[in-house]
Design a protein with these regions (language model features):
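Bacterial N-terminal signal peptides that target proteins for export
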Residues: 1-8
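Extracytoplasmic soluble-region selector
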Residues: 23-26, 30, 40, 50-171, ...
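A generic structural signal for short, non-catalytic loop/turn and secondary-structure boundary residues
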Residues: 9, 62-64, 181
Length: 594
């Protein structure tokens, strides 16, 4: 397998996924009570309850005759800084059927909907100092409740690393004026404009190229809920530009304040420290509403071949070697691998093309203890190239086509999910399969249909097929994407709800089906598409995720291959969001490939 230099995360919004139940948010007026659900800023009176209820029986004696409540202030915006929490005193008023409106604050319970933003001490709200965000303030007594929005805007001026050229005192004052010198405008290089990030990755670098000799910069992140500025010199010169990795606390301030609230605007301003100011273009950076879970395993050829593991959300999130070659356990490299859907088991192929000895691990927490590690190729029943697990991890399907016998190539084998051994079950096909995939709902197998045989790892001129479960077996193959001259469609992978697949598509150079850059491996011209698992379905190019970054300089041939879904769907506004990893040769800003 040729080297794949990088792994990208793509966010996909599944707007057709309905939420279980609905949450209705109103305008948060916080006005006089009326019938409602108590979550939209309006209060609730007795008529808003089902059945006949004597309100006086559920109220303290001082509130007998209460008919409605309201809260002040309404729809409040407060400023939070790392040095000082925001505070706000709230008052709740009651309307009675036999006396004037009165302050009833001491009789009600006050709380915020999002407790990570702060708490009430009596009727006084006090925020945390670590981040801002959006929440609702709720007040209630007996059958009555009232709510109002609360906006906490996080404001911070942070200083970058120290250098031999110290920052000026209060550097934010240097940037107080308007831009005066366009020649000082930096070029913002990374992150890519329009990127969405998981809030818990805790790693973000900003790359830029200075202009006009400037060496004092303001990295500004701005949003209705945030004004976060970092003042910095070019502390890490890289490829003619500058790189700054956000401190973990800064990343959390940024992500926890704005997750799920839409794009943050990133702009870099530069000063010549003599009154001249210039600004870069503005890029949008968005943080997803919910954290990405689990981790990702991937194969690398950097610094020796290995299967690597990266755990999202770790305090120190760095890739670690999971399995590597030439140690006491493995006589050669392992590359292609398949993880069970519960993340507990893994099956691997050893030796690459024309080898395919199986390595099986029933417990990924103990990678030193292989359950099955075939020493040679004598047992043809223990050779695989690609594999895919059923939903409960009790078995996996596998293919191996690096043999001369066509009937053996045209076969899907099933293996025991506890031992890794091949079962006495298989499916004979009228074509050679590769890149086997089992849907999360267990009802479909998908695969590449090989047009021109080479090896299972590098098949030419593929289409895509699916097979549907019929009772205890799978039915005849159905063509989702037919084989087409000069194009290779390969490596399907199902979304968590099995409603569609992503796959790689390569257009062959000069229409040559047998070109090395069109062999279903790390093809330079590969792009990521999505398609429903139905005959004749129309593929959709994932243009936003597949677009080039600044340093790619418009090059759209980025070797985007082997897309893999995270198994977890997350809330994102009114829809659902899932993440896809893609191997790629795209440039990591100023750091280049890899």
């Amino acid at each position: 397998m040729r080297q794949l230099l990088g792994c990208a995360l793509l966010a996909m919004a599944l707007m057709t996924w309905g939420c279980e139940g609905t949450v209705t948010q109103g305008n948060g007026s916080g006005g006089d009570t009326s019938q409602g659900d108590g979550l939209n800023g309006d209060g609730v009176n007795a008529d808003g309850l089902s059945g006949d209820v004597d309100n006086d029986l559920t109220l303290p004696p001082s509130l007998v005759g209460l008919t409605a409540i309201r809260i002040e202030p309404q729809d409040k915006t407060l400023i939070v800084t790392p040095q000082a929490p925001a505070t706000q005193q709230y008052t709740v008023y009651g309307t009675f059927d036999d006396k004037p409106e009165a302050d009833i604050t001491s009789e009600v319970v006050l709380h915020v909907q999002e407790p990570s933003l702060g708490l009430f001490i009596g009727a006084k709200f006090q925020s945390v100092t670590t981040h801002g965000g959006e929440t609702m303030v709720h007040a209630g007594v007996g059958p009555f409740s009232v709510s109002t929005p609360l906006h906490l805007k996080f404001v911070s001026n942070a200083l970058g690393p120290e250098t031999s050229n110290p920052l000026p005192t209060a550097p934010w004052t240097v940037f107080a004026g308007a831009d005066t010198s366009p020649g000082l405008a930096p070029q913002l290089v990374y992150p890519n404009d329009g990127v969405m990030l998981p809030p818990n990755v805790a790693q973000l670098e900003v790359h830029w190229r200075p202009s006009g000799g400037a060496d004092l910069f303001e990295l500004g992140f701005h949003h209705a809920a945030l004004d976060l500025n970092i003042y910095i010199r070019c502390t890490e010169p890289t490829s003619g530009g500058c790189v700054h990795k956000l401190e973990p606390d800064t990343y959390r301030q940024l992500a926890e304040t704005t997750d799920g609230l839409g794009p943050v605007q990133l702009t870099i301003r530069a000063s010549d420290e003599a009154g001249g100011l210039g600004s870069s273009a503005t890029f949008d950076v968005e943080f997803a509403q919910e954290a990405v879970e689990g981790g990702v395993y991937y194969w690398t050829t950097s610094d020796g071949t290995a299967i690597m593991r990266f755990d999202f959300g770790d305090a120190e999130p760095n890739p670690e070697v999971f399995v590597t070659a030439n140690d006491d356990r493995l006589d050669t490299c392992v590359g292609c691998h398949a993880l069970s859907r519960d993340g507990k088991k893994m099956v691997m192929s050893k030796g690459g093309q024309n080898d395919g000895r199986i390595v099986f691990l029933s417990d990924v927490t103990r990678p030193e203890n292989f359950d099955l590690n075939v020493p040679n190729q004598d047992d043809q029943d223990l050779l695989i190239q690609f594999a895919a697990w059923n939903p409960d991890g009790t078995r996996f399907a596998a293919i191996y086509g690096d043999v001369d016998n066509e009937s053996q190539r045209n076969r899907v084998h099933f293996h025991d999910g506890n031992t890794g051994l091949r079962l006495n079950e298989s499916i004979d096909l009228p074509f050679e399969p590769s890149h086997i995939e089992w849907s999360p709902d267990g009802k479909m197998l998908a695969m590449s249909r090989v047009g021109t045989h080479q090896t299972s790892q590098r098949p030419f001129n593929c289409g895509l097929e699916v097979m549907r479960k019929q009772g205890n077996s799978f039915g005849a193959p159905e063509t989702v994407i037919p084989i087409q001259p000069g194009v290779n469609h390969f490596n399907p992978n199902f979304a968590p709800d099995s409603s569609f697949m992503v796959f790689s598509r390569s257009v062959c150079p000069n229409g040559d089906d047998e070109n090395d850059e069109c062999d279903g491996d790390s093809d330079l011209y590969a792009q990521t598409y999505a398609v429903q698992p139905q005959p004749g379905a129309t593929p959709v190019f994932l243009a936003r995720g597949g677009g080039p970054g600044v340093e790619d300089q418009g090059n759209k041939n980025l070797s985007d291959t082997f897309p893999r879904f995270s198994p977890f769907a997350k809330r994102q506004g009114a829809g659902r969001l899932v993440w896809v990893t893609v191997s790629s040769r795209r440039r990591f800003g100023l750091r280049g490939n890899g």
